[in-house]
Amino acid sequence: MEKIAFLGLGHMGEPMARHLLAAGHPLVVWNRTAAKAGPLVAAGARATADPADAVRDADVVITMLAGPEAVREIADAILPALRPGAHWVEMSTVGPDTVRELGERMPAGVTLVDAPVMGSTDKAAAGRLGILAGGDAAGVEHILARFGPVTRTGAPGTGAALKLVVNTAVIGGVALVAEAMKLADALGLAEGTARDALAGGPLGGAVARAFAEGVHFGSDLAVKDITLATESARLPAMEAVLGHFAAAAADPDVVHEDIARAVTHIRARRDA
């Protein structure tokens, strides 16, 4: 069975790595905050303080990191240590430009797959994430399936591109629901009445996400993803949405909370 190195044990990475252990894969893990590896080590993984050491003997390297800068930094550390025949599966939300940069830096014989995920911590724990796999994923599709259904998106970078499209729609929908609820507040409507009416219409999915519980996607991550999207195309509506989430991310009580918390923040804003 393939030896796997998993780098990044945050809200998403830790439960994903558990599925690999449960499947019997020899697993080496690394995280910038080393203490987060403790529960996985107790479950049978090996932890290392050096990301290069983590990947040196790995057949498959999986990265689940905060964003493009973190991925570039880890690339500097691990690229010299990747062995020929290995696959690097980049599962962070970084956009297609970063994937192209990484592809240009791949050592001979190493395959890069961009495979960001759809879903939050609840789906990560349940193994029901949606995997958007770009590039030559044939050699790792069975491993990606440990996390949930795999959609092959095409050429390298297309998984990262489609993830930006999906997140733009989700984040924009949440902001739209927040503004609709702000209007309901201004017009004196009962929250439950407005929420139920919205939930019963075409925006039902966005309403469910705007008021979701038990999931985690922080306003800081929303800002990162919207920024990537608005750098790729002119998106006036999403530029306005970026203002909402940037304000939420500037609030230390909200920045790392799920975007459902940002809905309350948007409804309460007096400057927008």
Regions picked out by a protein language model, each given a short descriptive name:
Residues 1-62, 101, 121, 151:
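NAD(P)+-binding Rossmann beta1-loop-alpha1 motif at the extreme N-terminus of oxidoreductases
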Residues 21, 38-42, 103-107, 141-145, ...:
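Class I S-adenosyl-L-methionine
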Residues 159-269:
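Helical "substrate-binding/catalytic lid" subdomain
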Residues 53, 60, 66, 70, ...:
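Amphipathic alpha-helical hairpins
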